């Protein structure tokens, strides 16, 4: 099973926020996920990012691949692979 760390869109139309989740790469963007490890709100100024570093590190060590946007968020938060 290929596991990805990616964003799951939440919120209203034109007012999105995102949850950072660990999911099977075959499931849909807003579908089934394994675990929630944080959130990202791009609407606030400055953008708000909260990541549970313990869970994120565990999943990265287990081989989960972050998407490009999540990789950028991890770098900004000081969490690198």
From Swiss-Prot:
GO cellular component: cytoplasm; small ribosomal subunit
Top-rank taxon: Bacteria
NCBIfam families: S16 (TIGR00002)
Coiled coil: none
PANTHER family the record matches: 30S RIBOSOMAL PROTEIN S16 (PTHR12919), SMALL RIBOSOMAL SUBUNIT PROTEIN BS16M (PTHR12919:SF20)
Pfam family, one: Ribosomal_S16
Source organism of this protein record: Clostridium botulinum (strain Eklund 17B / Type B)
Keyword Signal found: no
Membrane-spanning parts: none
One of the GO BP terms on file: translation
Signal sequence annotation: none
InterPro entries per the UniProt record, alphabetical: Ribosomal_bS16, Ribosomal_bS16_dom_sf
Annotated keywords: Ribonucleoprotein, Ribosomal protein
Protein name in UniProt: Small ribosomal subunit protein bS16
Acetylation keyword on record: no
Family: Belongs to the bacterial ribosomal protein bS16 family.
Gene symbol of the encoding locus: rpsP
GO molecular function, a single term: structural constituent of ribosome
